[in-house]
């Protein structure tokens, strides 16, 4: 078995990473804890409301108690129940049922670790290369979007497994064994997988018919994967929650519910509100040196999809996607199919749109974030597609949105 084989129990709760930080990083560690709390609560600030104790008003909607395994632990759904004049209790119950069903199905569709009787999912596709399989339209559309965007990073499944091993390491010496920047074997493996991922003749998605997919994998790649013990060619990895939040939002809106907002713990947001009557806020953070600084909050009206690219840990899902060495070096999940290594153009980039979902917004901006540095001109081109950006230069906020509004932080 290859040393990057994923632990079959890796999706279960894992022990907290115990990285020994040097004293010079203590300040940053404290700030990171504060940021974890901000994002862990939904990465949202509702500047226009107070949560009501009564029957009507804004509530957090949860999945049904005792429901099957689902993806809801990564998301927060809040909804203004009763605002349309209907029973708040009845509306909350109906929303919970819709949310539960969608969260269970989403968990199963994007699962790469096990199969389920009622769906054909990523695990099934990975286990049956070169076979035509009929999948749910949600998974079909996700795979088609990534393929159409030529985002070959979805084929880096083996390297994402190795990155998780790195990030779960309890000291730098162990982590370095999985780091292509520090270990020759890891570098050789990253280069080999990247070479396969770059080449459509070695691996590619084919779409032969309606809701039909076929993961083409060459004999050479299959032989290498067998030698290394790989279990997954395909993995949405850090991109997964962008597709899941779109699915959850579409299911809720599809049932006529629009006075809500969904956020993920790693910074994705789908605001469903089309009334234009409420003002929402999104906190702005910037990593300057070793300190994560608050730069106020961006105010906006719905509907809106927000994507947060970040080169540091910012929420609980990031625990298994990022690793910080004692010297401050950070490893991130933004691996490139060009070389199998992580690349980030800046400490953070926020992109948002009122026209597209999180997945489309992410795919439109991903290559900008993987460049050597952020290009204002390139981001202006995105603005022509109604995808707007916020970033920092010399600790100053930059934006391509003429209507951008920020509430300054109190100092």
Annotate each language-model stretch with its function.
Residues 2-411:
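Mature catalytic core of soluble alpha/beta enzymes
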């Amino acid at each position: 078995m290859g040393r990057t084989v994923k632990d079959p129990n890796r999706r279960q709760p894992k022990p907290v990473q115990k990285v020994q930080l040097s004293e010079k990083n203590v300040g940053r560690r404290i700030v990171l804890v504060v940021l974890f709390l901000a994002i862990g609560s939904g990465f949202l600030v509702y500047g226009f409301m107070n949560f009501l104790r009564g029957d009507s008003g804004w509530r957090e909607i949860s999945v049904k108690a005792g429901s099957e395994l689902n993806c809801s632990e990564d998301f927060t759904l809040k909804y203004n129940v009763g605002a349309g004049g209907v029973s708040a209790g009845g509306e909350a119950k109906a929303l919970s049922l819709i949310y539960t069903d969608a969260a269970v199905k989403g968990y199963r569709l994007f699962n790469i670790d096990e199969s389920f009787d009622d769906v054909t999912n990523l695990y099934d596709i990975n286990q049956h290369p070169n076979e035509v399989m009929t999948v749910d339209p949600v998974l079909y559309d996700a795979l088609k979007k990534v393929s159409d965007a030529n985002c070959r990073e979805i084929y880096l499944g083996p390297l994402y497994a190795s990155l998780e091993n790195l990030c779960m390491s309890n000291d730098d010496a162990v982590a370095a064994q999985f780091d292509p920047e520090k270990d020759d074997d890891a570098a050789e493996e990253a280069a080999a997988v990247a070479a396969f991922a770059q080449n459509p003749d070695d691996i590619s998605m084919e779409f032969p018919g309606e809701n039909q997919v076929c993961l083409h994998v060459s004999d050479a790649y299959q032989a290498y994967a067998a030698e290394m013990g790989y279990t997954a060619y395909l993995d949405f990895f850090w991109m997964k929650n962008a597709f899941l939040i779109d699915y959850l939002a579409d299911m809720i809106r599809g049932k006529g519910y629009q006075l809500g907002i969904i956020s993920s713990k790693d910074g994705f947001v789908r605001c469903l509100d089309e009334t234009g009557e409420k003002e929402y806020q999104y906190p702005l953070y910037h990593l300057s040196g070793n300190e994560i600084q608050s730069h106020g909050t961006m105010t906006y009206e719905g509907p809106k999809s927000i994507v947060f690219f970040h080169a540091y840990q910012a929420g609980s899902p990031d625990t298994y996607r990022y690793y910080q060495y004692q010297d401050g070096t950070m490893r991130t999940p933004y691996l490139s199919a060009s070389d199998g290594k992580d690349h980030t153009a800046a400490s953070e980039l926020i992109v948002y749109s009122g026209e597209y979902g999180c997945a489309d917004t992410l795919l439109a901006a991903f290559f900008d974030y993987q460049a050597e540095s952020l290009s204002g001109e390139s981001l202006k081109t995105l603005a022509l597609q109604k995808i707007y950006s916020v970033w920092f230069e010399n600790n100053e906020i930059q934006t391509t949105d003429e209507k951008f509004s920020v509430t300054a932080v109190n100092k």
